[in-house]
Amino acid sequence: MMGRCTPWIIGGIAVLATGGVLAATATAMLAENFSLGVLLAFFAFAMIGVGVSASGTSVLVLLAKRVEDHRRAAAATIVWLMMILGLAMTAGITGHLLDPYSHERLLVIALAVSLIAVCVSLLALVRLEGNPGSINHASAETAAPRVPFTHALREVWSEQSARQFTIFVFVSMLAFSAQDLILEPFAGIVFQFTPGETTKLSGLQHAGVLCGMVLCALACGRFGSRWMGLQFGSLRVWTVGGCLASALALIGLVAAGMIGGSYPIRANVFLLGLFNGAFSIAAIASMMRLASTGRGHREGTRVGLWGAAQAIAFGTGGLIGAAASDFSRYWIDDPGIAYGVVFFAEAGLFLVAARLAFRIEPQPHPHQAADKSTSYTAKWKRKEHHEPAI
């Protein structure tokens, strides 16, 4: 049972939904009992993080195991497109329903969204994974022997490409998530947006992410790779370019904090989402390709390692971003400039991520590596037995 992904996905979704309802409850509780509200919020958001990590990483592992090598990048693209579409739709709809704001309205909406998420997930998982014996494409004779997890982890970490990609995932997700929790307060304080308007702004950002993912998927397909003979279909180009463009969009938010109400904040946020989507889907497609490279059948271990790096960075980035904005606002009187300092630091992280992505060495396809290994073995055997080459 522990080797199956479905129980982990269902459990993660259940924990996530419970955490969402508790977070809304904590928000209402803050007005009456601040200390108890903060304590409940701490546990609620911890549950959200655990739920997202457990379900999201398990989905990636299931994808890596069930989908053939040459289709993994496209499958990961579809999965992430659906995820971002769900985020954009939920943010847009709940943003409209939240106005006029009240604690009771927030709690009802959170409960409804959580129930819908659990029900849709359960329906989607029906007969998706199949029997445990059908998960691996390899037969029982060719399947890799089971090894201790720590040994498999050390083996994967010793691979240069896996190690480089893990560091890239951590830094890029740190930059991505650091603005996640402060963008809405920034819009509310500097631009006087209502809670409903800030939620809709988040939906606009996710719509940009969706567009960026579609654009990257088209460019990395036949259309992009053949257009004028240029390298528009390269995942590395889109990953590095998306990180650089995301840094520029964050510099735009620095300018937004300095200029204030007349700045086109919605267009800037949409562009930030567009560039985030382009780099993230290219990185995800690269991840699914890299999952099959290296020694042995370690797709699950590699994806788990990268998923853990993403989860740790996402939680750490949100915490650091929120703490940095509070610290900056404590020392800087102008809130727009205070938030701008944090956005500027996040732009620097994206520049570092772009450099890391550029240095990741491309790996040969596993089938090509196997063919090379087979040819070398055949030559060696012919030499040993003095057989003539065919």
Predicted regions and their residues:
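C-terminal transmembrane helical hairpin of 12-TM major facilitator-type secondary transporters
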Residues: L235-A283
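Helix-to-loop junctions at the C-terminal end of transmembrane segments
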Residues: M1-G3, L98, G212-L235, S325
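Glycine-rich segments within core transmembrane alpha-helices of 12-TM secondary carriers
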Residues: A73-L98, W306-G321
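C-terminal ends and interior cores of transmembrane alpha-helices
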Residues: I9-S35, V240-G261
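Juxtamembrane intracellular "pre-TM" segments in multi-pass secondary transporters
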Residues: P132-T166, V190, H367-I390
